[in-house]
């Protein structure tokens, strides 16, 4: 027995959009027929995009070919600027010489190459990555050049050896004693210090004697005061029953800030210090015996000598 499919009632379709409903018919007027569609009209076709052209392709018959490699930028710097100036001057000089040859060719005959030939580096040395500027000239004279002059000319046709043999530098001699500051630095008993070493010497409880001097202003007085101080220091260094004082010297022309801090305006001047405090200033030249008595008074509780001014002594703390 065959079964027929179940027949369902058809659903009414919805009204079409875009149709104006007719509410009623008027006498003598016929309804206008409107045709509408539910689907929108298709969009117009877009024009095709032009294909991009590469740099190596020709744009046309009239357009020249583009380079396949990017040109290197010119180097900038002192060397390149100097080379540009040299090229400019060289070009102008060549123009001047050319005009001179046109007017009177006999003037420059037999002169040879007036302009020096320009030295250029090879292509391998001038490539990037070598770290050197293009067109850099080679060294003029090598260190091991056999033609290097041993005695160079210092000007006006005078050799250095001839000048110093004729005008020798000699130390000043005072009272038959030669003033040799260079030897004093190496072999002297009084050490010369600078402002960086001052704190390590001053901030110490042991006795300290400072001589502020000048090498080239009143050199005789400064040298004599230094020699007397060395003799007095040797006396205490040779004695075994007491600790000798420390003795240093400061050049006023070199250590200006330190001399200003010590309030020293005239040289030579001797300062007696203890614990970063100035006990006494001696501005006059004293002999070694007088300095021994002054050191004993300030540091070893000895009797005050007559050469010490009691009013100039710093008061005790």
UniProtKB/Swiss-Prot annotation:
Signal peptide: none annotated. Residues 1-83, 114-138 are annotated as: Disordered. GO terms for cellular component: chloroplast nucleoid; chloroplast stroma. InterPro entries: MRL7/MRL7L, Thioredoxin-like_sf. The keyword Plastid applies. Residues 48-59 have a biased composition (Basic and acidic residues). Keywords: Chloroplast, Plastid, Transit peptide. Residues 23-32 have a biased composition (Basic residues). It comes from the Eukaryota. The keyword Coiled coil does not apply. Residues 1-10 have a biased composition (Low complexity). GO terms for biological process: chloroplast organization; regulation of DNA-templated transcription. Residues 1-69 form a transit peptide. It is found in: Plastid, Chloroplast; Plastid, Chloroplast stroma, Chloroplast nucleoid. Its main location: plastid. Residues 121-135 have a biased composition (Acidic residues). Plays an essential role in early steps of chloroplast development. Involved in the regulation of plastid gene expression. Required for the proper function of the plastid transcriptional machinery and protein accumulation in thylakoid membranes. May function as molecular chaperone to ensure proper organization of the nucleoids in chloroplasts. Component of the transcriptionally active chromosome (TAC) complexes. This is Thioredoxin-like fold domain-containing protein MRL7 homolog, chloroplastic. The gene is MRL7.
């Amino acid at each position: 027995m065959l079964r027929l499919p179940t027949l369902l009632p058809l659903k009414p379709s919805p009204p079409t959009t875009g149709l104006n409903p007719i509410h009623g018919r008027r006498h003598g007027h016929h309804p206008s027929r409107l045709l509408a569609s539910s689907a929108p009209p298709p969009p117009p076709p877009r024009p095709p995009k032009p294909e991009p052209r590469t740099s190596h392709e020709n744009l046309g018959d009239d357009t020249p070919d583009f380079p396949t490699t990017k040109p290197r930028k010119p180097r900038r710097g002192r060397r390149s600027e100097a080379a540009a100036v040299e090229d400019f001057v060289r070009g102008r000089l060549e123009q001047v010489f050319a005009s001179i040859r046109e007017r009177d060719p006999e003037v420059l005959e037999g002169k040879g190459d007036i302009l020096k030939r320009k030295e250029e580096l090879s292509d391998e040395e001038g490539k990037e990555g070598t770290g050197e500027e293009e067109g850099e000239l080679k060294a003029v004279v090598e260190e091991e050049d056999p033609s290097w002059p041993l005695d160079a000319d210092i000007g006006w046709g005078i050799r250095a050896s001839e000048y110093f043999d004729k005008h020798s530098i000699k130390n000043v001699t005072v009272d038959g004693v030669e003033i040799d500051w260079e030897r004093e630095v190496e072999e002297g008993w009084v050490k010369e210090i600078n402002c960086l070493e001052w704190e390590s010497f001053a901030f110490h409880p042991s006795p300290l004697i400072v001589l502020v001097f000048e090498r080239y202003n009143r050199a005789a007085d400064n040298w004599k005061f230094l020699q007397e101080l060395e003799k007095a220091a040797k006396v205490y260094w040779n004695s075994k029953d007491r600790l000798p004082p420390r003795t240093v010297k400061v050049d006023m022309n070199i250590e200006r800030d330190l001399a200003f801090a010590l309030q020293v305006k005239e040289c030579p001047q001797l300062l007696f210090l203890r614990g970063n405090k100035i006990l006494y200033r001696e501005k006059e030249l004293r002999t070694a015996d007088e300095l021994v008595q002054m050191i004993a008074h300030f540091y070893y509780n000895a009797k005050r000598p007559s050469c010490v001014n009691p009013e100039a002594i710093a008061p005790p703390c």
